[in-house]
């Protein structure tokens, strides 16, 4: 709730947890999705269910990240593959959250969290710029603020509380298209459900295409992985390649939506 409040107030809210904590945050995640505000939730996965294996690693929360909210509540999901990759994917989670006005789930796990590797720390000038655009006034010809009027990315405006002329309703009850007024109309609800899904799907236009990590693009066998299995899979594939096997490896970082060319690979 504090992270949601930070995002509502114009900062980027970020919270970290593990599987059981994700279960407890389910209702709040649904609220953040309905509010359509930028937020990052990091799930450092461990063995489950319940208390499970709290000191052991497991990649068991992917379906929870996809569907672990009531109703139809799509949230983008990305995953780090190595300790150094955590920085890049955390940065990417913030970028997606801000530019697309949505909560983002970043998956890691105990293996990555307890791992280490050499890594060159990037300078600020080396990082891509994240564009932050706060709504500060009504646009020319705009008679009243429409908090759910969308841009080309289907993202709504980010209006800071207290900005004169931009007062609007906020909360978990379904909103009317564009006006943000409370609406129980079934046709509007269907429209908004599809709109929120379309917004997440459209993120695929703004993420990198999938690449082959090792091996030929036309190999006979493709090993597909995600998360902390990266090093293990790569080592196994390289060993098979040294034996003359036609094996390739690709590792997915963008779990929802997938890169647009993933099916072609």
Spans of model-derived segments:
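Thiamine diphosphate
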Residues: 1-67, 76-97, 242
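A generic, residue-level signal for flexible/boundary positions that often mark functional hotspots
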Residues: 16, 72, 249-252
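A general structural-boundary detector
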Residues: 52, 73, 80, 183, ...
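Short, flexible turn/loop "capping" segments at secondary-structure junctions
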Residues: 68-71, 215-216
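A short small-residue
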Residues: 71-74, 176-177
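Flexible, low-complexity linker and terminal segments
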Residues: 89, 94-265
């Amino acid at each position: 709730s504090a992270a949601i409040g930070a995002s509502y107030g114009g900062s980027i809210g970020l919270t970290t947890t593990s599987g059981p904590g994700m279960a407890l945050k389910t209702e709040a995640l649904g609220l953040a999705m309905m509010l359509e505000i930028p937020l990052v939730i990091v799930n450092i996965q461990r063995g489950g269910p319940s208390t499970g294996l709290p000191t052991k690693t497991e990649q068991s929360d992917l379906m929870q990240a996809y569907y672990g909210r009531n109703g139809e509540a799509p949230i983008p999901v990305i995953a780090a593959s190595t300790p150094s990759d955590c920085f890049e994917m955390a940065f990417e989670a913030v970028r997606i959250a801000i530019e697309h006005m949505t909560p983002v789930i970043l998956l890691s796990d105990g293996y990555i969290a307890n791992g280490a590797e050499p890594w060159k720390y990037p300078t600020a000038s080396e990082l891509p710029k994240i564009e932050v655009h706060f709504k500060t006034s009504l646009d020319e010809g705009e008679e009243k603020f429409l908090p759910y009027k969308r841009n080309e990315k289907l993202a709504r405006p980010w209006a800071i509380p207290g900005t004169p002329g931009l007062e609007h309703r906020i909360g978990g009850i379904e909103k009317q298209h564009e006006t943000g007024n409370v609406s129980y109309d079934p046709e509007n609800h269907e429209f908004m459900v599809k709109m929120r899904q379309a917004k997440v799907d459209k993120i695929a236009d703004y993420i990198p295409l999938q690449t082959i990590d090792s091996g030929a693009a036309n190999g006979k066998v493709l090993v597909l992985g995600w998360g902390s299995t990266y090093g293990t899979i790569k080592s196994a594939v390289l060993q098979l390649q040294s034996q003359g096997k036609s094996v390739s490896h690709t590792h997915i970082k963008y779990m929802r939506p997938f890169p647009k060319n993933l099916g072609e690979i």
